[in-house]
């Protein structure tokens, strides 16, 4: 009886030790970033690319979970600065966003996004100068006939204040001017839908949202194409940034390296309407200074 009782105690202790080791191993893996879930939040312009990367990465890395959410660049930068997510996606440099402590944020550029004005197909305009765009979005021009279009009231559709696409558009299309107060939308997809269905509407979206049901507007006579961004002739574009708080964990670093790899850039970046980093013939810093490679 005593021997049997002792054996039971030993067996129970063995089970407890094994369970403890398993819990410790799990906690260690999670702490070190191995197989920990990856959550990316922010730019809706960058969202389709990160979603494609996440889906593909999970197939080749079983056990890794990649969750991608929009919300705009401001949300992404705020969340990553707080350490609430793994990755913060942004169309602008963290230093450009007011209220963001960028000191501990590390920038990983993964693509370039062109941004184009779009208008409802009935306005009768397919080309605008930077000066005209500024006048329209600041409310100085309110009728399409004043820029060569139909006699129709201009309806502004803006991205939300925290949008990186909006910040990039105001910086590079409007020379830093602030858009007039108008209806705002959180996503590029919704913006495109509203412009399509609203007479007189104008807004702006990333090239990835280009479609035949709205008119893509030339800027200073230059078509919004990848080639024209690459050679520097088209002015409205931005780098797509993914920020980490400090150096990335092992899994997060692996995911970022995958997105920056030649294989991924060739397979997905251009296919989804972005511009590969290695295709750029110029480099532009945060102040707009351009150097040719």
Predicted segments with their positions:
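Exported/periplasmic ABC-transporter solute-binding proteins
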Residues: 2-74, 78-82, 86, 90-293
């Amino acid at each position: 009886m005593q021997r049997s009782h002792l054996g039971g105690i030993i067996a129970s202790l063995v089970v407890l030790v094994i369970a403890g080791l398993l819990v410790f191993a799990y906690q260690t893996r999670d702490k070190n970033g191995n197989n920990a879930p990856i959550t990316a939040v922010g730019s809706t312009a960058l969202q389709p690319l990160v979603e494609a990367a996440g889906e593909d990465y999970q197939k080749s890395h079983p056990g890794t979970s990649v969750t991608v959410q929009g919300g705009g660049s401001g949300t992404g930068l705020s969340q990553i600065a707080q350490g609430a997510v793994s990755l913060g996606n942004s169309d602008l440099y963290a230093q450009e966003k007011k209220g963001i402590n960028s000191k501990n944020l590390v920038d990983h550029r993964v693509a370039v996004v062109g941004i184009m004005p779009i208008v409802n197909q009935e306005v009768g305009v397919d080309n605008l100068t930077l000066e005209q765009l500024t006048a329209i979005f600041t409310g100085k021009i309110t009728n399409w006939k004043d820029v060569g279009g139909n006699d129709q009231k201009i309806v502004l559709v803006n991205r939300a204040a925290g949008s990186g696409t909006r910040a990039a558009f105001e910086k590079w299309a409007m020379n830093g001017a602030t858009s007039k107060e108008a209806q705002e939308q959180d996503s590029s997809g919704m913006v495109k839908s509203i412009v399509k269905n609203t007479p007189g509407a104008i807004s702006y979206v990333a090239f990835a949202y280009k479609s035949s049901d709205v008119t893509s507007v030339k800027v200073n006579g230059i078509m919004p194409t990848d080639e024209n961004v690459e050679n520097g002739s088209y002015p409205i574009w931005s780098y797509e940034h993914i920020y980490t708080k400090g150096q990335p964990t092992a899994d997060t670093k692996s995911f970022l390296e995958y997105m920056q790899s030649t294989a991924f850039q060739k397979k997905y970046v251009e296919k989804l309407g972005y511009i590969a980093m290695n295709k750029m013939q110029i480099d532009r810093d945060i102040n707009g200074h351009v150097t040719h490679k």
